[in-house]
Amino acid sequence: MKFGKSLSSQIVETLPEWRDKFLSYKDLKKRLKLIGGGGGGEERQAKRARVAADGGEEEAAAAAMTPEEAGFMRLLEAELDKFNSFFVEKEEEYIIRQKELQDRVARAAGRESKEELMRVRKEIVDFHGEMVLLENYSALNYTGLVKILKKYDKRTGALIRLPFIQKVLQQPFFTTDLLYKLVKQCEAMLDQLLPSNELPVSSEDGRGDSTNEDKPSNPSSSLVNGGTIPELDEIEYMESMYMKGTVAALRSLKEIRSGSSTVSAFSLPPLQGDSSPEEQQELWNKIPVIEQAAK
């Protein structure tokens, strides 16, 4: 599958409301088609060589650009600004949400409120999933930049991909250390709320099955420490949108990183965490059925 179609598919499978925040790959390809091929001729190459001798390769590339190429690069820079603004905004939002969830966990534990603990840990799982989606956002956009710049270099004869990607590696949207830290803190909260001796309940017989995505026919749930709730026969079972999106995102990340066996300067780094799509599904299945019901 071509990257443009793959990107569209991934957006639909993860968080379609982020659609306009992703790389405008189709628009960049349209701009690229406006650029004449062939590398610009001997005169252009000579001009580039003269400027490179005085001011460096980046300045030389800019000086030798046609108006169409300059328009392409302006759009590319605007895309970087878009990624960074959205990514930083989400990180700031996640810092606040993480603190709020930590406070809610502490309050619920202090009151020994089983229902509130169930609600908050469901929200933590959703929150964890959304942060994984943001990591997927970073990886997809990076991959798209690498691919469109490869097309640009091939069409123009320029060699801007490597210096541009080196610049990208320093951008906020690609710097996911803080996001990774938030994800690990989120997992630590879940570890506190999901003790190892608690049996996950994801179906009526009480056996957790991470591969079973069918709707429970007669849902019931046991609460933490032996508390019970009434039968939930009238409540329609719904999987969380973030659970679905997160599993799709993790599969996408795995595919992106395994797309080529050759490691190069443009390869994505390995995932910092060790979550797989199956492990994320299992994490979801640890939440009692009532917390997967429609809100």
Swiss-Prot record:
Keywords associated with the record: Nucleus
Primary residence: nucleus
Stretches the record annotates as Disordered: 197-227
Top-level taxon of origin: Eukaryota
Domain comment quoted from the record: The SPX domain is sufficient for inhibition of PHR2 binding to DNA.
Annotated function: Involved in plant adaptation to phosphate (Pi) starvation. Inhibits PHR2 DNA-binding activity via a Pi-dependent protein interaction. Suppresses the regulation on expression of PT2 by PHR2 and accumulation of shoot Pi. Optimizes growth under phosphate-limited conditions through a negative feedback loop of the PSI (phosphate starvation-induced) signaling pathway. Regulates the expression of SPX2, SPX3 and SPX5. May be an important link between signal transduction pathways related to phosphate starvation and cold stress.
Protein name: SPX domain-containing protein 1
Organism from which the protein derives: Oryza sativa subsp. indica
